[in-house]
Amino acid sequence: MAIAHLATEYVFSDFLLKEPTEPKFKGLRLELAVDKMVTCIAVGLPLLLISLAFAQEISIGTQISCFSPSSFSWRQAAFVDSYCWAAVQQKNSLQSESGNLPLWLHKFFPYILLLFAILLYLPPLFWRFAAAPHICSDLKFIMEELDKVYNRAIKAAKSARDLDMRDGACSVPGVTENLRQSLWEVSESHFKYPIVEQYLKTKKNSNNLIIKYISCRLLTLIIILLACIYLGYYFSLSSLSGEFVCSIKSGILRNDSTVPDQFQCKLIAVGIFQLLSVINLVVYVLLAPVVVYTLFVPFRQKTDVLKVYEILPTFDVLHFKSEGYNDLSLYNLFLEENISEVKSYKCLKVLENIKSSGQGIDPMLLLTNLGMIKMDVVDGKTAMSAETREEHGNQTAELQAMNIDGETKANNGEKNARQRLLNSSC
């Protein structure tokens, strides 16, 4: 019995989740995959286009070209270019063929893209500092408790198995039909009011995190729509050239007769900027439905992650179905995102697959039988060693008996020889 008890300890200790020496859940993902994809594209694309715009500026060298008279030196021509480039946002110094054309949009196009990139990074930044720490602590607690629930189930199976071994419950008629019920009645104290279940139920009445999540998604959608409006308007200017007329007669040059009244100028990078605006506009238009989809992701009533824990007793997943928008629906999504960190989920998923294989095998009964198989193997080895020791004992006893018989015969022979010598001497 002691050997069987020790074997049971080894079997169930293999299934218990080991406590790691280093901190658990180091790589928790505190942002949903679809949200992270939206952030990377919405923020990364403008930064990429800005780098291309500045690379084009470095390769060309100047963003404006003005036609100066041949009598001007290169310093005077450079002054005209610089003056007209600085006066792009001043309407009183410019006259365009297309009327009041906002030429400053061309000048500040890279910086406006940078502004949109910064604005689109604000919602994820707010989420990281306002909501992520709270979700991180809650997820660690929930996942640790889920592992503990699994461990308690293994301990309960061990307790039930030990009780059956001590009391001979296996010989009671009808125990096979009621094995699952009696198994958990023995260790009911292990499962009274699982704290993780009660904690998750409280999230159905909480809306703090879901409000922050929806606010971030709405803000992202609004910024993307504003960016699409700006890029669409900028692209509509493609039919208008970047040519304009600039006057530099101001200050000491106002009465200078050698300076022409107007200079014909052209913005060189307009064509490149319009191409970049088309690329950014197309990507943002395709990205907007994805952001709308993220608004409805928490509305999904999915509890697939927790459903596998229905194998364990008293863990009622049906009560975890969220009704509308609440924190519970958000926690379900983040549990699904970090399910690879939960070791008990992997083990229970294997048992669930065995259960759904159609063979009619109860996973917990299979777990108990697995312990019995291990104990049978150990008992078999013990029985074989006992038989071997018995055979060795029998062989030793036979050898000892043979030695005793040999010594007796030798002593009798010596006595007979001495008697014959005495008789002959007489």
UniProtKB/Swiss-Prot annotation:
Disulfide pattern: C66-C265, C84-C246
Ion transport listed as a keyword: yes
Positions where Phosphotyrosine occurs in the chain: Y199
InterPro entries per the UniProt record, alphabetical: Innexin, Pannexin
Extracellular side: 62-106, 239-266
Record-level GO cellular component terms: endoplasmic reticulum; endoplasmic reticulum membrane; gap junction; plasma membrane
Annotated organism of origin: Pongo abelii (Sumatran orangutan)
Sites marked Cleavage: D376, V377, V378, D379
Transmembrane domains' residue ranges: 41-61, 107-127, 218-238, 267-287
Any Pfam family matching the protein: Innexin
Name assigned to this protein: Pannexin-1
